[in-house]
Amino acid sequence: MIQAEEFVIVEKKHLDNFTILYVEGLIKLGESAEFFSSALENVLKNESTNVIIDFTKIDYIDSTGIGELVGYLGKFTTQNRKLIIVNPSERIQKLLKLAKLDAVFKIYNNEEEAIAAESGSPAPR
């Protein structure tokens, strides 16, 4: 477990061509947003996989966190890679929709659905 302020990367795992980051807490201005950014930068520079961020345990994200997501979406896209969000809470879904980012990000209910849709193989049962 890697931790900063109120933000924690609980686990990182690899599955097929995806790195999955399991995160929890708050992504907001300050140390937590910087830590979130460094985790994404680490995957961007040190791995050649697509990234899935599991938002199941993210309670809050502010404009700084949203800005980091949008910035890294551009960086991953430039490298022909994907940045995918899974399991966002209803509150986060509303926020993404309000900012019209639900049309920009690939958002799925769970990692299995995301991997199946983005790799072209059927979801595991």
Identify the function of each model-found stretch.
Residues 106-110, 114:
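Short acidic-hydrophobic, aromatic-tinged amphipathic segments that line or gate anion-handling sites
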Residues 4-38:
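STAS-typified acidic loop motif
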Residues 28-105:
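Amphipathic alpha-helical interaction surfaces in cytosolic regulatory modules
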